[in-house]
Amino acid sequence: MRIVFRVLKNGTTNVFKAVREMILRSGLPFEPAKINKQWPRFACGPSLAVHQQALREYVDIYLSALVPAEEVQRKLEEASAGELVILNVQRVPYAMPSVQNLAAAAIYSVEGPFTSFTLEQTVENYFNASRVEAVYRSETGLALTKNIKPYVLQAQTLCADKIRLTLACAEGKWISPQEAVASYLGIEIPAQQEDWTVEGFTFVREGLYWQDSQGALYLI
């Protein structure tokens, strides 16, 4: 079963544990995990980085018996303990790729003081360039310039202080929306600092998308 859910604001920070406990409380007939047979087998979607929020998160759970999707949703809602909001439950083929492997793009909304920066181009024009550079600076002072153009499918201005970014998985790798925004604002990115963010900005992942052979995106 593919579960789409949302973590309540100011809720748990350990989503993996919250999902595991929810499945255990639900009483659903689950397949056991390989490491601990008392735990359910499940696979979470791509995790959020530090300083990011999400409107939709994903988990695939493996059941040992056929249970209607409506019943699965009802039992998970009852077992969520006020930490998670179940948005959708869908039966998917057993051999279907996990969300981790299926996701080809992610859409983020970014809100912050863009008007406080001297920007020569709109975000649309900036990311429409043939090459878009981000600068990474190490603690030793060495700088690395990286072309992040392959990772940015689209950029859109929503209002003066809010944009939307569609980021792609390119050759199995992602960049964070923080990296894209830093590039646009002309801010250097500290290399190898996973907890780094662009101060004063909020980053919300609206959803993950799979891509067909024609390049069209579909919400997972």
Where are these regions (language model features)?
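Helix N-cap motif at beta-to-alpha junctions
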Residues: 64-69, 113-117, 170-171
